[in-house]
């Protein structure tokens, strides 16, 4: 039988078996899962986006309102 795959907990680096026996995977525990969620909620973690892409994404939202005079 092969060894089960293990991954490192993203919060504390503890080895975690990737199986149904580890319901919080990839985290080692519910505590580490909540610590990570809190970091995303407080914007300690972010997905990098180039400033140009962000400007392009929201440029349509900033159009001046049409005035019918």
Swiss-Prot record:
State where Zn(2+) binds. 9, 12, 28, 32
Q: Please give the Pfam families that the UniProt record associates with this protein.
A: YacG
InterPro entries to which the protein is assigned, alphabetical = DNA_gyrase_inhibitor_YacG, Znf_NHR/GATA
Which cofactor(s) are needed, names only? Zn(2+)
Q: Which GO terms describe its molecular function?
A: DNA topoisomerase type II (double strand cut, ATP-hydrolyzing) inhibitor activity; zinc ion binding
Keywords on record: Metal-binding, Zinc
Q: Give the note describing cofactor binding and stoichiometry.
A: Binds 1 zinc ion.
Q: A GO BP term, please?
A: regulation of DNA-templated transcription
Q: Where is this region: Disordered?
A: 47-69
Asked if the Swiss-Prot or TrEMBL record annotates the protein with the keyword Zinc, the reply is: yes
Record text on subunit structure and interactions = Interacts with GyrB.
Please report which protein family the annotation says this sequence is part of: Belongs to the DNA gyrase inhibitor YacG family.
User: Briefly, what is this protein's role?
Assistant: Inhibits all the catalytic activities of DNA gyrase by preventing its interaction with DNA. Acts by binding directly to the C-terminal domain of GyrB, which probably disrupts DNA binding by the gyrase.
Q: What name goes with this protein? A: DNA gyrase inhibitor YacG
Please state the gene responsible for encoding this protein.
yacG
């Amino acid at each position: 039988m092969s060894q089960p795959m293990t991954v490192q907990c993203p919060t504390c680096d503890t080895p975690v078996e990737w199986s149904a026996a580890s319901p919080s995977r990839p985290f080692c525990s519910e505590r580490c899962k909540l610590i990570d969620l809190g970091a995303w909620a407080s914007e300690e973690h972010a997905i990098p986006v180039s400033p140009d892409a962000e400007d392009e994404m929201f440029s349509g939202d900033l159009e001046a309102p049409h005035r019918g005079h």
